[in-house]
UniProtKB/Swiss-Prot annotation:
Activity modulation notes: Contains an N-terminal autoinhibitory domain.
Bias type Polar residues, positions: 94-105, 167-189, 314-328
Major localisation: cytoplasm
Region Disordered, residue ranges: 28-193, 303-364, 376-396, 712-773, 787-838
Tissue occurrence: Expressed in roots, leaves, guard cells, stems, flowers and siliques.
GO cellular component term of the entry, any: cell cortex
Enzyme category, top tier: transferase
Keyword Nucleotide-binding found: yes
Organism: Arabidopsis thaliana
Record's miscellaneous remark: N-terminal deletions of YDA results in gain-of-function alleles with phenotypes (no stomata and exaggerated suspensor growth) opposite to loss-of-function phenotypes.
Keywords carried by this UniProt record: ATP-binding, Cell membrane, Cytoplasm, Developmental protein, Growth regulation, Kinase, Membrane, Nucleotide-binding, Transferase
Entry annotation: catalytic residues: 525
Official protein name in the record: Mitogen-activated protein kinase kinase kinase YODA
C-alpha cells in the first residue's frame, strides 16, 4: 500500500496551509512562495526521473494541482544559501541538474562503483553535487518528516526517527527532496508512495525487506563497510544520546541509487531499542550492523526521544566495568570505512565534541568500599579474614589486635586476639551494635548477659573472662583462648571418643557445672560445640550467652537452647527445677561423645521436639559404653527434673569417680620443688636433636599409685603426688590403648604430655648436641628398671640404693659399664638447664636427682613388667635378661 491513497481535492485543500505553516515554522522558510508550482511536464516524465540523491517527497501529492508541486520543487532550487539553518542537522541547499541518465547506464554503476564516504553539508552552504550517473531511472524520491506530525493525516505517524538537536534539544524536521525538475515519472502518485509495514520498527533479520516500496530492488549492503557500533566494547548499548551523525557508505551494490547527500533518516546502526539507558542488552544487529537493509532506510520507525536516529560513532561504551573507570563518554568520530579529510562532517563532529560532551546516565553503583560502615569485613560471614591479615588495634586504648576468624555463632563472631606488647592471645567475641536491627539488639543483650555471668566466675573448667569494651558501633568481649577447639569439632575430625576420654571430659564438665550451680547459675546450652578442650586435655565450658542467674522469684525458663540437647521441661515450658536442665544436656552430650551425634538426631525440627517433650522412652544408648556409663546416662535423662541428681552428686558416680583430674601435681615442701625442677627439665629436652624417654602406660602407673610402693626404704604413695595420670587426648592417646601393639617407644607420642611421663619417639638420633641420644636414654631406663625390679643383682643397701645407686661416682660407674651393657652413663646438668650424658657428676646436684628423680622412675615402673622392650632399640643382651 502507498503511504496514502488518492486523496480528494477537498482534503488536500484543507491540509495545504497547515503543512506549509509547519514547514515554515520548523525549517525557517521565509515565505509561502517557496511552494511555487512546478511544471506539468514533470508529471508526464515521472518514469524517466533519476534523482542524484534525496528521498521520496510526499508533499507534491498533497498539492491540489501539478503546478503547485512544480513550483515547490523550483522554490527549493531557488533558495538562497545564506539563510541560517538549525543545528546540528543543517538544511542543505538543494539544486537540480539534468543528469541525462537513462536505463542504459545502470551496468556501469554495478561494475565500477567504488566505495567512498559522502560528506555532510557545510553549516551555511550547499553541498556540491557532482553529475553522477548510473542511478536507477525508476527510483522516485520521497520526503522525510520528523516525528512531530506536519499534517493531520494518519500517515504522519509513520515517519522517520526524530532528529535530536544536540545543542538546543529541539526537534528539527528534515525534508530532503532532491528532485530532477526536468525528468519526472508519469506514474500515479498512489502507485509511487507505499507505506512501509510497522514491523520495520523491530529489527528484521532479512536484508530483502524494502522499506520504501517495491522500487528499491535487490538492496544489498556490504558488511565490511558497515561495521559501525554504538557500543563495540560492550553488550550494553550506549546509555547516552548520541550526536546526530550520518554514515552512508558509497558502495551499495545493485541498488541503482548513488547517493550524494546524507539522509537524516538513515540509521545504519542501532535497533529499534536504540541506545536508551533502559534498553538493557540489545540485539546483535545493534553491535555489528547485521540487518543493514532495514537500518539503511527506516522511513517509518519511530524511536524514543532518548534514542539517536543516526548511527552513533564508535566509542568506548560505558558498560558494567567502564562506567566506573571512565569519565564522560565522548565520541571519537572515526569512520568505519575511512574518512574524508577536512570534510564538513569532521568539522561538525569537532564542534559538537567541544560543545556537548555526552554525560553518563545516573547509575546505581554500590559504594567503593565493599562493606557498608555498619557491616564491615569483620562481621561478614562470606568474607572471612585471612590469618595473615591482622587489623590495626581495635581502638587506641585497646591492647588487643583482631586476627583471623575463629568461628561464628548465633550472636556474633569470634576472632583471635593478640597483644603485641605482652604476647598474650585471647578470643575476641564481636557484636555489631545497631539500634534499629532486632537481631543486633538481641545479640548485644546476649553478650551483655554473658559478661555479667562470666565476670563473677573463676574456675579451671570455665573459660576465663578478661574484659570487654565498646569500639565505635561494635561491642567486644575478651575471653580465654582455648586452641584445641570444641568437642564437636574433635568429633567431626576424629570420630567418636573412647570411654576413658568420655569419663575424663564428663568429670571436668561436671566439675564446672557443680561450681556454676553452686552460684545459682544455669548454663542452658551445654553441648559439644560449647565445650572447649585445650592441648593438654583440659576442658573449658564456654558460651554463656544463654546463662541465667536463678533467683527465688524465677519462673519457668524461657525457650532457649539447642533442641537436641534441650530438657523436656524447657520444651513444654513447665515449672520445675531450673538447674536440672544442665544435667539433662550433660547426658545428651555424653551420648554425643559416644556416637558423634546427639540423641534423637534422626528427627528434625518439630518432630524432634515432640519426641523429646512427650516421648516416654529413652534415646538409644550405644552398646560399647560400659554399664557404668549407661547408668550415668540414664540418671541424667530422667524426665522428671526432680529425679535427676545434682552435679555434685554425679561427681561421686562410679563413671567419673575414679578418673584422675588433669591438674598438674602440686605438693608442698622441698621434695615437691625438686620434683617440679626435674619434671620441667625433662620436658625442656631439645626435641630437634633427640626425643624424650618412652611414655609410660598410665593405667599401670595408676594401679601402682592405688596400691602403693611396697619395697624399698618406705617409699609409698603418700610420698608421691596422687595425680600422676597423663592428660587425656580424645583420639590416639597412649593411655587408651595400653594393650595395643603400638606401645612404648614404638607408639607415636601423644600431643598431650604428662609432667611425669615423658613421651617418646621411635626415631633414634645420634650425637649429644645438648640432649641425650635416644639409645642412651632407653638404655638408661631399661637397665635401671632391670636393676631395681627383681634383677639378678640386688641393690646394695635398700634405701641407699634409691638415693645413690642410680647416680654413682665415675670410677664405679665405669667399672659397671664394662661388666654389663645395662649400665647407664652418668647424667649431669649443663649450663643450659638440660640433661646431658657423661661421666662427670657434680655431687652438689646429687640429692635432687637421686632423692626424687630416681624414686619417681622406680615408683612408676615397679608394675610395668609388660613394658615393650623392643630389641631393635636396645643394646644386645639387655632385652634377653629377665626382670
Amino acid at each position: 500500500m502507498p503511504w496514502w491513497s488518492k486523496s480528494k481535492d477537498e482534503k488536500k485543500k484543507t491540509n495545504k496551509e497547515s503543512i506549509i505553516d509547519a514547514f515554515n515554522r520548523k525549517l525557517g522558510f521565509a515565505s509561502e512562495d517557496r511552494s511555487s508550482g512546478r511544471s506539468r511536464k514533470s508529471r508526464r516524465r515521472r518514469d524517466e526521473i533519476v534523482s542524484e540523491r534525496g528521498a521520496i517527497s510526499r508533499l507534491p501529492s498533497r498539492s491540489p494541482s501539478p503546478s503547485t508541486r512544480v513550483s515547490r520543487c523550483q522554490s527549493f532550487a531557488e533558495r538562497s544559501p545564506a539563510v541560517p539553518l538549525p543545528r546540528p542537522i543543517v538544511r542543505p541547499h538543494v539544486t537540480s541538474t539534468d543528469s541525462g541518465m537513462n536505463g542504459s547506464q545502470r551496468p556501469g554503476l554495478d561494475a565500477n562503483l567504488k566505495p567512498s564516504w559522502l560528506p555532510l553539508p557545510k553549516p551555511h552552504g550547499a553541498t556540491s553535487i557532482p553529475d553522477n550517473t548510473g542511478a536507477e531511472p525508476d527510483f522516485a524520491t520521497a520526503s522525510v518528516s520528523s516525528g512531530s506530525s506536519v499534517g493531520d493525516i494518519p500517515s504522519d505517524s509513520l515517519l522517520s526517527p526524530l532528529a535530536s538537536d544536540c545543542e538546543n534539544g529541539n526537534r528539527t524536521p528534515v525534508n530532503i527532496s532532491s528532485r530532477d525538475q526536468s525528468m519526472h515519472s508519469n506514474k500515479n502518485s498512489a502507485e509511487m508512495f507505499k507505506p512501509v509495514p510497522n514491523k520495520n520498527r523491530i529489527l528484521s533479520a532479512s536484508p530483502r525487506r524494502r522499506p520504501l516500496g517495491t522500487h528499491v530492488k535487490n538492496l544489498q549492503i556490504p558488511q565490511r563497510d558497515l561495521v559501525l557500533c554504538s557500543a563495540p566494547d560492550s553488550l550494553l548499548s550506549s546509555p547516552s544520546r548520541s550526536p546526530m551523525r550520518s554514515f552512508i557508505p558509497d558502495q551499495v551494490s545493485n541498488h541503482g541509487l548513488l547517493i550524494s547527500k546524507p539522509y537524516s533518516d538513515v540509521s545504519l546502526l542501532g535497533s529499534g531499542q536504540c541506545s536508551s539507558p533502559g534498553s538493557g542488552y540489545n540485539s546483535g544487529n545493534n553491535s555489528i550492523g547485521g540487518d543493514m537493509a532495514t537500518q539503511l532506510f527506516w522511513p517509518q520507525s519511530r524511536c524514543s526521544p532518548e534514542c539517536s536516529p543516526v548511527p552513533s560513532p564508535r566509542m568506548t561504551s560505558p558498560g558494567p566495568s567502564s562506567r566506573i573507570q571512565s569519565g564522560a563518554v565522548t565520541p571519537l568520530h572515526p569512520r568505519a570505512g575511512g574518512s574524508t579529510t577536512g570534510s564538513p562532517t569532521r568539522r561538525l563532529d569537532d564542534n559538537r565534541q567541544q560543545s556537548h560532551r555526552l554525560p553518563l546516565p545516573p547509575l546505581l553503583i554500590s559504594n567503593t568500599c565493599p562493606f557498608s560502615p555498619t557491616y564491615s569485613a569483620a562481621t561478614s560471614p562470606s568474607v572471612p579474614r585471612s590469618p595473615a591479615r591482622a587489623e590495626a588495634t581495635v581502638s587506641p586504648g585497646s591492647r588487643w589486635k583482631k586476627g583471623r576468624l575463629l568461628g561464628m555463632g548465633s550472636f556474633g563472631h569470634v576472632y583471635l586476639g593478640f597483644n603485641s606488647e605482652s604476647g598474650e592471645m585471647c578470643a575476641m567475641k564481636e557484636v555489631t551494635l545497631c539500634s534499629d536491627d532486632p537481631k543486633s539488639r538481641e545479640s548485644a543483650q546476649q553478650l551483655g548477659q554473658e559478661i555479667s555471668v562470666l565476670s563473677r566466675l573463676r574456675h579451671q573448667n570455665i573459660v576465663q573472662y578478661y574484659g570487654s569494651e565498646t569500639v565505635d558501633d561494635k561491642l567486644y568481649i575478651y575471653l580465654e583462648y582455648v586452641s584445641g577447639g570444641s568437642i564437636y569439632k574433635l568429633l567431626q575430625e576424629y570420630g567418636q571418643f573412647g570411654e576413658n576420654a568420655i569419663r575424663n571430659y564428663t568429670q571436668q564438665i561436671l566439675s564446672g557445672l557443680a561450681y556454676l550451680h553452686a552460684k545459682n547459675t544455669v548454663h542452658r546450652d551445654i553441648k559439644g560445640a560449647n565445650i572447649l578442650v585445650d592441648p593438654h586435655g583440659r576442658v573449658k565450658v564456654a558460651d554463656f550467652g544463654m546463662a541465667k542467674h536463678i533467683t527465688a522469684q524465677s519462673g519457668p525458663l524461657s525457650f532457649k537452647g539447642s533442641p537436641y540437647w534441650m530438657a523436656p521441661e524447657v520444651i513444654k515450658n513447665s515449672n520445675g527445677s531450673n538447674l536440672a536442665v544442665d544435667i539433662w544436656s550433660l547426658g545428651c552430650t555424653v551420648l554425643e561423645m559416644a556416637t558423634t551425634k546427639p540423641p534423637w538426631s534422626q528427627y528434625e525440627g518439630v518432630p524432634a521436639m515432640f519426641k523429646i517433650g512427650n516421648s516416654k522412652e529413652l534415646p538409644d544408648i550405644p552398646d560399647h559404653l560400659s554399664e557404668e556409663g549407661k547408668d550415668f546416662v540414664r540418671k541424667c535423662l530422667q524426665r522428671n527434673p526432680a529425679n535427676r541428681p545434682t552435679a555434685a552428686q554425679l561427681l561421686d558416680h562410679a563413671f567419673v569417680r575414679n578418673v584422675m583430674p588433669m591438674e598438674r601435681p602440686i605438693v608442698s615442701g622441698e621434695p615437691a620443688e625438686a620434683m617440679n625442677v626435674a619434671s620441667s627439665t625433662m620436658r625442656s629436652l631439645d626435641i630437634g636433636h633427640a626425643r624424650s624417654l618412652p611414655c609410660l602406660d598410665s593405667e599401670d602407673a595408676t594401679n601402682y599409685q592405688q596400691k602403693g610402693l611396697k619395697h624399698g626404704s618406705g617409699f609409698s604413695i603418700s610420698q608421691s603426688p596422687r595425680n600422676m595420670s597423663c592428660p587425656i587426648s580424645p583420639v590416639g592417646s597412649p593411655i587408651f590403648h595400653s594393650h595395643s601393639p603400638h606401645i612404648s617407644g614404638r607408639r607415636s607420642p601423644s600431643p598431650i604430655s604428662s609432667p611425669h611421663a615423658l613421651s617418646g619417639s621411635s626415631t633414634p638420633l645420634t650425637g649429644c648436641g645438648g640432649a641425650i641420644p635416644f639409645h642412651h636414654q632407653r638404655q638408661t631406663t631399661v637397665n635401671f628398671l632391670h636393676e631395681g625390679i627383681g634383677s639378678s643383682r640386688s641393690p646394695g643397701s635398700g634405701g641407699n640404693f634409691y638415693t645413690n645407686s642410680f647416680f654413682q661416682e665415675p670410677s664405679r660407674q665405669q667399672d659397671r659399664s664394662r661388666s654389663s651393657p645395662r649400665t647407664p652413663p652418668h647424667v649431669f646438668w649443663d649450663n643450659n638447664g638440660s640433661i646431658q650424658p657423661g661421666y662427670n657428676w657434680n655431687k652438689d646436684n646429687q640429692p635432687v636427682l637421686s632423692d626424687h628423680v630416681s624414686q619417681q622412675l622406680l615408683s612408676e615402673h615397679l608394675k610395668l613388667k609388660s613394658l615393650d622392650l623392643r630389641p631393635g632399640f636396645s643394646t644386645p643382651g639387655s632385652t634377653n635378661r629377665g626382670p
